[in-house]
A protein has these predicted regions:
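N-terminal periplasmic "start-of-domain" segments of outer-membrane beta-barrel proteins
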Residues: 29-59, 88, 99
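Conserved C-terminal beta-signal and adjacent last beta-strands/turns
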Residues: 20, 192, 237-239, 443-445, ...
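Short acidic/polar hinge/loop motifs at secondary-structure boundaries
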Residues: 106-133
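Periplasmic-side early beta-strands and strand-to-turn transitions of outer-membrane beta-barrels
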Residues: 158, 167, 182-274
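Surface-exposed extracellular loop regions of Gram-negative outer-membrane beta-barrel proteins
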Residues: 305, 418-423, 436-484, 503-537, ...
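Outer membrane beta-barrel strand-and-loop segments of large Gram-negative receptors
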Residues: 344-350, 383, 389-391, 477, ...
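Gram-negative outer-membrane beta-barrel transporters
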Residues: 357, 361, 398-403, 503-505, ...
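Extracytoplasmic beta-strand/coil segments of soluble accessory domains associated
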Residues: 68-106
Length: 716
């Protein structure tokens, strides 16, 4: 163990060995209300579907700069490796394509290279995050094979609200949040603006010599490129009658990734930046009959458009004035060229009804249409798909005794796809409560995911130390999955321990596979002369299995320690047509061991000064890939502090600061090879928040509760 590791371990021991007060305070984060697993409200401790929650208090203590930062730092099940294509997110070994990301129960939309843009979600406006692993819920679609992340946003009920939060950090990192809300009679409005910017950074100027003609040690390629994005959103709600509410909301988003150019052709010469324009519109309503029964209707439209923004004269794919395709079409500085325009329209009708004999029924209908326009990347320039679904779920409770209670939640979802037909996917979850301290849970669920238009029809070229050709595959088959999980939860005097074992078997898994160039269409090889060709193909079978362990221990009212560990084992096989046999294939980006840990201390120095301090760590073993090397293992530590100053009943000031990557770890693997982490090394940040709120529903900070809290059940 080297000196840095000893120092880190010593800090951890100091944090966890602080003596508890004699009056041990039982953590009541288990009183958190969750909705994601079943679509109905449950206390976390009584949720029949295993749900992990990142609470508002955890978010405040951690001070994350983005959703990616939050998930990576506070739960071991996630892995990220940010690049121009997105966050490269994984959950228990399965990538972004298998993870459903929701904001208040509604899907976010749009991706590049299969990666969602997590910058669409303003971290300052997050109330809490609920995570359900596996295709455990019939409510959100069986294509969520890896799991569901539901980001619950803050709900503002003040008569007048104005807030500003500004964060600055190393490498030109700027995060700006502005919110304005008001209520006039039965009408409420909230307008949100967010701005994010980073100058980017370069961990190394060396290129992988195996991918270049000679050694290059002065490359201009960045580890993370300079980028800027902003978003404006508006939400209106109207409540004409008690229990009846209508809403309308919309947003617009813009992002540009700036790519510096160098002097080595095919390596670091860049002639265009990447630009995105997103828009979304949604409307709907909720009719609450009584405390338990309700009907909701949601209709939404989303657009995600991706462009090249040219910075130099470039010859590329295009159509001449006569409509003929040419790979030598001239583009000039400031020209914009559409690469893909993804549009999605959805309608969702759902009802929740209480039935006799301790049953609660949820049922719904869903319609979805996907449209893709990509003039240079899809044959005929466009493709579309449509899916319909009907689902039903029952929640049943039986008490064998006052302390022994069984909850069973079965569900069925009937899926229909315009190209691949019908598929019925069943699910069942059960929880056995043994007293107030022990919970045993089990889940079995099936998933069904059809190929996307991009996986079927896409064709694109990526220049990265040479030309890489990526191809769709019209012969793809739908993916199916069987997910099994067993978990045990134990609670005792502030200690919460959860152990979960799982197996996720995916048949016909779709992934990018390197194929011989002679298997690609000849016209593409002649036009682009790629050094490697990758195509979407079905694997014969793939398995991810592992164990997740989570521990939280509330030592007293001020001290809390905890951590999580994830063990992952994967197995994937593909049929080799050349040798007519099954061969092992690596699931890209998987790491066998991941962990995270924390120790926090919160203290009220006075009624006008609440302070919090946190020490955090995370680690990962080697991440494995099919090509271009494996990512190195790493261990990163972080310190953060936050201070709230409620100077009056209307005004609140909040100051945050921290150091990330305390021991300055940097992965200097040459460009062209995979990194374990893209961190630039030690960074610092500071955030100032100013909030003015006025109205009869305004909640103020007292000795133990934050003025930022909007969920009355969250006290963690």
């Amino acid at each position: 163990m080297n000196r840095r590791q000893k120092w880190a371990f010593g800090l951890w021991l100091i944090a966890v060995s602080v003596s508890a007060q004699t009056d041990v305070w039982r953590s009541d984060s288990l009183q958190e209300v969750v909705v994601t697993g079943t679509g109905t409200q449950h206390l976390l401790k009584n949720a029949p579907v295993q749900t992990e929650v990142i609470t508002a208090k955890m978010l405040r203590n951690y001070g994350g700069r983005s959703l990616q930062d939050i998930l990576a730092g506070l739960t071991a099940s996630f892995a990220f490796n940010e690049d121009d294509m997105g966050a490269q997110m994984q959950l228990n070994g399965l990538g972004n394509d298998y993870i459903l990301i929701l904001v208040d129960g509604k899907r976010i939309h749009g991706d590049v290279g299969g990666q969602n843009d997590l910058n669409l979600i303003d971290p300052h406006n997050i109330e809490k995050i609920e995570i359900v692993k596996g295709a455990s819920s019939a409510l959100y679609g069986s294509d969520a094979i890896a799991g569901v992340i539901n980001v619950i946003t803050k709900k503002h009920n003040e008569g007048l609200l104005a807030e500003n939060s500004t964060r600055v950090g190393s490498y030109g990192d700027i995060r700006q949040h502005n919110g304005v809300g008001f209520a006039i009679g039965k009408l409420r409005s909230y307008t949100n603006f967010q701005l994010q910017h980073s100058d980017g950074w370069q961990n190394t100027a060396t290129e992988d010599p195996r991918q270049t003609e000679f050694l290059i040690e002065d490359s201009r390629n960045m580890t993370v490129n300079r980028h800027t994005n902003w978003q404006v959103s508006e939400r209106l709600t109207y409540e004409p009658l008690k229990g009846l509410e209508f809403y309308a909301e919309g947003s617009t988003y813009w992002k540009r990734i700036y790519r510096p150019t160098g002097k080595y052709r095919g390596v670091d010469i860049k002639t265009y930046d990447m630009m995105y324009r997103n828009q979304s519109l949604a409307a709907g309503g909720k009719w609450q009959f009584n405390k338990t029964d309700q009907v909701t209707l949601d209709v939404n439209w989303d657009r995600h458009a991706y462009y090249y923004y040219y910075t130099a004269i470039t010859l590329g794919d295009g159509y001449d004035p006569h409509g003929n395709f040419t790979p030598y079409y001239p583009f000039f500085p400031d020209d914009e060229d559409l690469q893909s325009d993804q549009r999605r329209t959805m309608a969702h009708l759902k009802g929740i009804f209480t039935l006799p004999y301790s049953n609660r029924l949820s049922a719904g209908l869903e319609w979805r249409r996907d449209y893709l326009e990509a003039p240079m990347r899809v044959r005929d320039g466009e493709a579309s798909d449509h899916t319909e679904a009907a689902y039903v779920q029952d929640e049943f409770r039986h008490a064998f005794s006052p302390k022994t209670i069984l909850d069973i939640t079965p569900g069925l979802r009937l899926n229909h796809n315009g190209q691949f037909g019908f598929r019925l996917t069943p699910k069942v979850s059960a929880m056995l409560s043994l007293g107030s301290d022990i919970r045993l849970r089990a889940t079995w669920s099936q998933g069904f995911k059809t190929p996307t238009p991009k996986e079927l029809y896409y064709r694109y070229v990526r220049n990265m130390n040479g030309t890489y050709l990526y191809l769709g595959n019209e012969d793809l088959r739908p993916q199916t999955s069987n997910y099994y999980a067993l978990s045990g939860e134990y609670n005792w005097q502030g200690l919460n321990v959860t152990v979960t074992g799982y197996l996720n078997r995916v048949d016909n898994m779709i992934t990018l596979v390197t194929i011989p160039n002679n298997q690609a269409p000849g016209e593409y090889i002649i036009t682009y002369d790629p050094i490697k060709t990758r195509q979407y193909q079905n694997l014969e079978s793939a398995k991810t299995k592992g164990i997740d362990v989570s521990l939280r221990w509330r030592l007293d009212r001020e001290w809390m320690v905890g951590g999580s560990y994830s063990y992952l084992d994967t197995e994937a096989k593909q049929y080799d047509t050349t040798h007519e046999c099954l061969v092992d294939v690596v699931i890209d980006g998987t790491a066998r061991h991941k962990g995270s840990w924390f120790a926090t201390w919160n203290h009220d120095f006075s009624k006008a000064w609440h302070a919090g301090f946190g020490l955090y760590g995370r680690m990962s073993s080697t991440r494995h890939y099919q090509i271009n090397g494996d990512g190195k293992g790493y261990q990163i530590w972080r310190f953060s502090t936050n201070h709230e100053f409620p100077v009056s009943k209307k005004w609140l000031f909040r100051l945050e600061a921290g150091i990330d990557n305390i021991f300055d770890y940097v992965d200097t693997t040459p460009h062209g090879l995979h990194l374990g982490t893209t961190t630039p090394g030690r960074t610092v940040y500071a955030t100032l928040t100013v909030r003015f709120a006025h109205g009869k529903n305004l909640k103020f900070t007292n000795n133990k509760k934050s003025n930022f809290k909007t969920n009355e059940n969250e006290t963690d």
